[in-house]
């Protein structure tokens, strides 16, 4: 067995003292306290970051208020909030408040609250976007904005999507993992019949599902305004049809954690 000479041992001690002395000079601390600070800093940097909640954003159509629970977009967001007091951030927004929804997403993803998103915080994103009519167009447009920031989206859901001016609601951006489209073809106001992926290798289109209310009408809109009930009838029927929204809810819940084991990350209050 090779033993260190007295000279080698002395040299090692001098090097160790020099390192601690430099640390004390730089940080203004006693050597042992400085070493402890360095150890604590390393432990903090090695600690795993908190996981962000699953984010579910719905957009209402037309000029509907985000808190009008007679409309399924708002009602579904409220249901999810009630089922997931923690671990999920669910909110409905007017379709003209996309920037507010975008800001809410960035705020929820910023788990270390430093005002900017790291690569890890972006990669941790689990986002679901849905909407009806103009709201569906906004959902796709918001997904496209998130693509520019390298933020992935789990799922987009369009219900009788009506394209807004300067938007494209038929081509799903490549940052979206899955997308689905529900539409009806009748009336002067009706949705897109087909959506497609900008990059089929990255986005799976779950389907373009057609509903025909001329053959199978539903009477679910008694609480809606006269215009919706008598002029945009089919467009309104698909907005309140339980057969459609049960499928929408099932698609969303399939991406959420089990309610009995929701994570402890608490979403910030909805800002409207």
Where in the sequence are the language-model features?
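Bacterial N-terminal signal peptides
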Residues: 13-26
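Solvent-exposed, acidic/flexible segments
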Residues: 65-73, 94, 98-101, 132-139, ...
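C-terminal catalytic-base region of ester-bond hydrolases, centering on the histidine
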Residues: 174-272
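Signal peptide processing junction and immediate N-terminal pro/mature segment
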Residues: 25-41
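Serine-dependent carboxylesterase/thioesterase catalytic core
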Residues: 76, 80, 87-88, 105-197
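Bacterial N-terminal signal peptides that target proteins for export
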Residues: 2-16
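Long, low-complexity intrinsically disordered segments that are proline/alanine-rich
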Residues: 37-51, 260-272
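Active-site catalytic motif of lipid deacylating hydrolases and related acyltransferases
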Residues: 48-125, 230
């Amino acid at each position: 067995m090779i033993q260190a000479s007295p000279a080698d041992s002395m040299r090692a001690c001098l090097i160790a003292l020099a390192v601690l002395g430099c640390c004390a000079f730089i940080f203004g601390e006693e050597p042992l306290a400085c070493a402890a600070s360095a150890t604590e800093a390393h432990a903090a940097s090695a600690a795993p970051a908190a996981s962000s909640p699953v984010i579910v954003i719905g957009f209402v159509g037309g000029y509907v208020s985000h808190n009008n629970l007679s409309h399924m977009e708002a009602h579904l967001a409220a249901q999810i909030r009630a089922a997931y007091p923690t671990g999920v951030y669910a909110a409905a927004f007017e379709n003209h408040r996309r920037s507010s929804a975008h800001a809410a997403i960035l705020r929820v993803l910023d788990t270390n609250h430093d005002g900017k998103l790291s690569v890890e915080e972006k990669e941790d994103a689990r986002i679901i976007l849905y909407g009806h009519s103009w709201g569906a167009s906004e959902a796709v447009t918001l997904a496209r904005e998130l693509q520019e920031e390298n933020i992935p989206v789990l799922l987009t859901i369009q219900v009788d999507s009506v394209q807004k001016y300067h938007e494209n609601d038929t081509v799903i951006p490549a940052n979206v993992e899955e997308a689905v489209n529900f539409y009806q073809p009748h009336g002067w106001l009706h949705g897109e019949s087909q959506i497609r992926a900008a990059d089929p290798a990255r986005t799976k289109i779950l389907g373009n599902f057609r509903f025909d209310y001329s053959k199978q009408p539903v009477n679910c809109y008694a609480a809606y305004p006269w215009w919706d009930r008598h002029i945009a009838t089919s467009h309104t029927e698909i907005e309140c049809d339980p057969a459609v929204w049960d499928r929408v809810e099932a698609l969303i819940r399939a991406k959420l954690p089990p309610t009995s084991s929701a994570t402890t990350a608490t979403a910030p209050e909805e800002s409207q």
